[in-house]
Amino acid sequence: MVDTIGEARLRKSAVVADSLNRLLTEVAIRCAKEEGVRDYFYVSVLGYGGRSVQSAFSGALQGRDLTPISQVAEYPLRVDQRVKLKPDGAGGVVEVKTDFPVWVEAQANGATPMCGALNRARDLLSAWIAEHPRGFPPIVLNLTDGEANDGDPIASARQLTQLRTDDGNVLLFNLHISDKGGAPITFPADSSSLPDAYARSLFEMSSELPPHMREYAASNHYDVREGSRGFVYNSDMVSLVQFLDIGTRALALR
């Protein structure tokens, strides 16, 4: 991911890393109780590029796969200082410094071994489900900026989503990160509006949004209906953040 997103001229890899770090922070906060962070989530972040698929965690978690959220919260690589603008109560804004934990750093490695990444996720989740057969079905969020160049991702996706717990099948949601302009296509129920075979293949790979996720998406003003899939094409930065939020925050509604 060495290209940029639209007019913002930000490296796509940096945008993805920033969004993932923000998501991990928010998930950890949601799981925080008086006695500490509860392990409502196990998290794995896989980076794929060039010829490799590997854990994208850095620091103390480097090389870790599925990791309890309490350990994720405890071991960021570092904590950066960010500046946010907040209302000053008098009609203006003030700059406020805030901590920003970093677990994942931006990387750009050329090729797109998506099949390898999906197969790695399948292996990780197969082992996790064997130990947690009654758990909530795992969710895989696949963020990609290019077509797979290591095989047929539809076949790999089907093997992944055939895994199931007692509560249902693994969910696979796909988001295409674009450097082109234009409105994203979000959570479509069919492929008629998609521009090409690549977009249609990502749509076919994607799971339908469960009812509670459709409800949450609708509350965020998305046009969703029965059959809508966890798929966003030609994503911009706003859609990326909202996609990650819907893919995880909806779990709290159950």
Residue ranges and their predicted role:
Residues 1-254:
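Acidic, low-complexity intrinsically disordered regions
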